[in-house]
Amino acid sequence: LGVIVVRTKRETNYEEKLSKRVKTSGCAQGTSFGDIMENFEGVKLPETKIKTSWLYSLGQKINATPSLYLAAGAIHGSVLCKGNHPLAYMEDVGRHNAVDKIAGHMFKRQILPDDKILYTTGRLTSEMVLKTVQMGIPILVSRSGFTAWGVQLARQANLTLIGRTKGKRFLALSGTQRVDYDIDPQTIPGERTEIQRKASR
């Protein structure tokens, strides 16, 4: 059994943190410890808008990006975007790990979050929403669906939450007033089948 001891300059009451347990809505009903929800209460993300043309463009660009998913499947991806431009693409077997890699990328390069979009392949659960809010990113997009608590927390934090993005379709359940319908979806070409993995997505 390996043991790692970490000492910090700041004192922390671990017993108090462990007593504050929050059941999450993700895989196997996880548990978050500490004052994460207390810190969440005062968060209000900026009123950053997103254009529907960006959604369509990002979907096409991300789907065409060479990746482990296209090669083998069974991989989650997270993409940091600005407007309709993907800035960083991270993959991992775990959807949370892929998001954490984006967080680390932003921290190391001191990237400001206010005008960014986080695009993920994972479900929009409470944990995904909490992580995105902690990162300060005002827009979270996924090709997957939602959980009820994830939507509730997104609305509380002023996070724009968009799921079920595929081709010309998407569903916005939080921050709908910040979605700018700037393009007719009928003018968007369909997804190219030659970039799909085994003819399916």
Stretch-by-stretch model annotation:
Residues 95-173, 178-185:
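Feature captures the catalytic cores and cofactor-binding loops of soluble hydro-lyases/lyases
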Residues 74-109:
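Protease-associated
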Residues 22, 31, 50-53, 57, ...:
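Conserved active-site and cofactor/substrate-binding residues in soluble primary-metabolism enzymes
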Residues 164-165, 189-193, 197-201:
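Phosphate/diphosphate-binding loops
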Residues 1-82, 88-89, 201:
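Intrinsically disordered, low-complexity regions enriched in acidic/Ser/Thr/Pro/Gln residues
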Residues 1-4, 85, 116, 167-169:
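Generic structural motif recognizing short loop/turn segments at the entrances and edges of beta-strands
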Residues 11-23, 90-97, 134-144, 187-192:
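Short, Lys/Arg-enriched charge-dense amphipathic segments
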